[in-house]
Amino acid sequence: HMGDYFSHWLKLGAQLAQPPRIFTVNWFRQDADGQFMWPGFGDNMRVLKWMVERCGGQAQARRSALGWMPGYDDLDWSGREGFARSQFEQLTEVDSAAWKKELALHAEWFTKLGSQVPAALLQKHELFSFAFWQ
């Protein structure tokens, strides 16, 4: 059962003295015209570098409803021309309406999984929901 699977990993993570930090990235986010918003594969290293620096306490971040994310000036844009601050801001914008729909789908899925959904996942879902419905 998926709930047991999640419980296993949450239990394992709780046993670690220094659990790894978890980052999420959507390299494939598209604009209204269906074009990819992130400039491309070669630029992924800019975000990966920020992640490593963030883990080492050397990088800044800004708070969002989803957690911490880099601002435009937090990434190393050396050697990169043509990716404007405005493009980055659009790319990293948190779409509340889309996330409300996504969280509703999560709630449906948790309902299907039943009582075996770990409380920690339900609590996290509640925190995210609160961030978008406050």
Language model regions located:
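Conserved NTP phosphate-binding and transfer environment spanning the P-loop NTPase/kinase superfamily
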Residues: 1-134
